[in-house]
């Protein structure tokens, strides 16, 4: 999994935990981003359990892993996947560290400032009046379920990302489609907000 893809996962997992209800049967892209902005209200940290299903284009069977995610304002995100495909990711603003315990691999990347969490927090700190540059965004409501799809205009690893959540704010799934035809579906459960996470809860070792 590349650093850019991990950035997309971390950003949109972070944005959802406290999403407000959508009233309209259809949503504009601006309305969809405003729902994301409202997700920050009153949320200082959160944890959630995840199940990840990875469908590789060259394999018929899915690779299924479980794990957890953690987030703490203003800019720390952690994701851990359990064995047999164990990995840990720590993102602090634009500094990303990936650890593969079984392989003994540890990689650290300094991402461009515009790809860090601080930029997105600044963007979503006020009501959304314009869309972020470089993305096509679609939002819609089907019954009580909200769908938000984000497609980068610049061709890279990710083809599209879709969030599926209930209008009451419960995140259900994160779907990531890559240009190599790989597909990842992350399902969320047991989400807990404002649990009082500290710095020690975001250590890779």
Where do the model's predicted regions map?
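Bacterial N-terminal signal peptides
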Residues: 7-18
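Short hydrophobic/aromatic-rich beta-strand segments that constitute the beta-sheet cores
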Residues: 50, 77-81, 96-99, 148-150, ...
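An acidic-aromatic
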Residues: 68-118, 184-185
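Short, surface-exposed coil-to-beta transition loops
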Residues: 64-66, 85, 157-161
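Flexible, processing/modification-adjacent segments and terminal tails
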Residues: 25, 37-42, 47-49, 54-56, ...
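Positively charged n-region of N-terminal signal peptides that target proteins for export
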Residues: 1-5
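Cleaved targeting-peptide boundary
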Residues: 22-31
